[in-house]
């Protein structure tokens, strides 16, 4: 089982002092408990919401989430990449299958995150790309499953692609039949 991020919506795992901590951690418990008592192995990668939706404090939030999963996952579920590092992390699933996990939020996070000064195995974008190329070349004859939160390429809104209807009639996103044409302003809405 691979959890592809946004494991705790809306802003990751808060400190235990936060008034809603118990409610928020219950969502994480449900994901962990799903695997207990089974033969399944689980992997959890962070998404932008686990990094406090890209805000300051995001690094601390994923460190709390990793510590929680490590403590209560009982070896059934692993949080990767570790320590807020970008990855890639390579896991052999079988003789012919390799799971490669990366933290895609690391690439776009504007606040504190591990970098050159960190203990991460790969500290820069170039090092991450080089290792990813090495993994792909080393496993060219296997099925490679690449697990990240954000898609590498998207033909949808996350990739910057919108339909003509979204550009001309942006209010139809809010109400199905609200066809008020806004040809210039409407193009700014999806952005």
Language-model-detected regions and their locations in the chain:
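Active-site beta-strand/loop signature of hydrolases that rely on acidic residues for catalysis
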Residues: 1-12, 47-49, 149
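Extended active-site neighborhood of metal-dependent phosphoesterases/phosphodiesterases
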Residues: 12-140, 144, 158-191
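Histidine-centered catalytic micro-motifs
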Residues: 146-153
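Short, glycine/acidic-enriched loop or turn micro-motifs at the edges of active sites
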Residues: 9, 106, 152
